A protein has these predicted regions:
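Short, hydrophobic alpha-helical packing/hinge segments within bilobed ligand-binding/sensory domains
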Residues: 43, 106-109, 125, 163, ...
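Periplasmic-binding protein-like
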Residues: 84-93, 131-157
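A ligand-binding cleft/hinge motif common to bilobed small-molecule-binding domains
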Residues: 111, 117-134
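Extracytoplasmic ligand-binding site segments that recognize negatively charged/polar headgroups
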Residues: 1-114
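Solvent-exposed loop/turn segments at secondary-structure junctions
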Residues: 27, 34-37, 53, 61-65, ...
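Mature extracytoplasmic/periplasmic domains
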Residues: 154-214
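Conserved C-terminal helix/tail region of periplasmic/extracytoplasmic solute-binding proteins
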Residues: 211-276
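Ligand-binding "clamshell"
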Residues: 13-16, 127-139, 201-204
């Protein structure tokens, strides 16, 4: 009863038979106001030559392709091979300006001023901004991905009654409030949003007003053929260009280690022979 209606009956569980919404998140741009001119309003800034070597991109195929797809006006759940290849070409075009493809590394890099701009999840950007007051956050005008983390009971659960009690416990107003404060993600729980003690209830990163609320799309599960296509294109993207040099360096390093090892073995063998 505490769950806001718009987060019920989602595409992956139309009648909420199997899941209960727990957290809500969206992807946006976190940027350093001392390094970026003005307020960005488009994903296109992540392709801007002006910020070459200062852009952090998701090291996550679905999110990375999603950004390119939003920028190109392509459905993020498309099954068209041509659409996925268009997004791939857009990501290839971006690669020369990317400093690094990151996930958790984004925290140290953005908080430490090592990069100017990154795409990441709104809830995590709250912590970044607390650790570096020069950081700001915005949702691009082209739209973005929204996701709802949900709680489920596994099919093989041996104590279904206890599992249901635990879920009800998590949905309780005071417990849901503690979770929302700790995790810093948006909550789908009305009891939390109505609580004046909730410190993030007016946070624009989590709850943007109507004017700043972006167009959103949920990532649906891709069919196996489309998933294989995306994975293949992503692998191709990562091994091209600068990453090829990394592969060469790795191979050379390995070869040097092998040579040094055999030289060491040879010297050691000769020393042993000289003792007899």
């Amino acid at each position: 009863k505490n769950i806001i209606p718009k987060y019920k009956d989602l595409y992956f569980d139309p009648n909420n038979e199997y899941s209960v919404p727990y957290n809500v998140g969206m992807v946006g741009l976190v940027y350093n106001t001392k390094m970026v001119e003005g307020t960005p309003d488009s994903w296109s800034i992540m392709w801007d030559e002006k910020y070459k070597g200062q852009v952090l991109m998701f090291n996550n195929s679905r999110d990375a392709f999603g950004i390119a797809q939003f920028l190109l006006g392509i459905d993020v759940n498309t099954t068209s091979e041509q659409d996925w290849k268009k997004a791939y070409e857009k990501l290839k075009e971006q690669k020369p300006v990317v400093q690094s493809y990151v996930m958790d590394d984004v925290f140290n890099k953005m908080e430490g001023g090592e990069a100017a701009i990154a795409a990441y999840y709104a809830g995590d950007c709250i912590g970044m901004a607390e650790n570096n007051p020069d950081l700001a956050f915005v949702y691009p005008k082209e739209g973005t991905n929204i996701f709802v983390d949900s709680i489920c009971i596994p099919k093989g659960c041996q104590n279904k009654d206890a599992a249901e009690l635990y879920i009800n416990f998590l949905l309780r107003g005071d417990i849901a409030l503690a979770n929302a404060e700790c995790l810093c993600y948006a909550t789908p729980n009305r009891a939390v949003l109505d609580n004046e003690e909730y410190s993030l209830r007016d946070n624009e990163m989590l709850y943007p007003d109507e004017e700043h609320t972006p167009t959103t799309e949920y990532f649906h599960n891709l069919d196996s053929e489309t998933l294989m296509l995306m994975t293949s294109l992503w692998d191709n993207l990562k091994i091209e260009g600068n990453d090829v040099m990394s592969v060469y360096i790795g191979l050379i390093t390995f070869a040097v280690i092998v040579v040094v090892y055999f030289i060491y073995r040879t010297i050691r063998k000769k020393k042993r022979e000289s003792m007899y």
